[in-house]
Amino acid sequence: MLLALEPSLKEKIEKQYEEWMACCPNKKKEADAWIKSADEDEAVCMKYLYAYMHPCDIVSYDVEVIASYVKATLDMYANVPYAKRVPAELFFTYVLCVRVNNEDLDKSREWIYRQLVDRVKDKKTMVEAALEVNYWCYEKATYIPSDDRTLAPFGMCNSARGRCGEESTLAVSAMRSVGIPARQCYVPRWAHCDDNHAWVEVWADGDWHYLGACEPEPVLDKGWFTAAASKAMLVLSLIHI
């Protein structure tokens, strides 16, 4: 087994899976069938995702879609050395996690991983890897305002442009695809004007850092929004499994 998990964590996931999936018995049968043929790592990851997944996603997406995230993430875990330094709770919540915002789940994780693995696998630190990922994001998309539903990573890469919420969705997805815990943060209203912004936080080498998605800097914890964010009355970060 690649994942070194405490027995108590595995028991917690198992219990939550059985209780939560009782609301969707037909989907549970499909998930159980997939899990039965999976190895131990795949099984526990699949159970975790379904154990904390929103009911709308449970019924809306085929088991194979969710399984694609599990397989891509475990493939990455086996081949990217620094991924094994990520604590289990962060791995499940901020790496394995399939959703960032309200984007479609588009099975993009494996594709992004293949795009990035050779650029990050030999990086000496996770900070260096995170910076490289953001350079890749900058190569794929730039900013344009919009009010439509959040584009998924494939949509962003195909259109090559999107608002800050879509740029950060792409960046979080890219970070997770190569084993860097990441989450989207946003301010619903700035203190100084009637506007908002979203950016990315990553866990690298033991600490959380922020960065502007698709806005690469030579270091983390730097962005055009630094001063404004320090004055914000409310900063949100939601966990979407």
Specify the residue positions occupied by each region the protein language model found:
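Secondary-structure boundary elements
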Residues: 3-159
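Hydrophobic/aromatic-rich core segments of domains that either
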Residues: 114-121, 125, 129-135, 140-154, ...
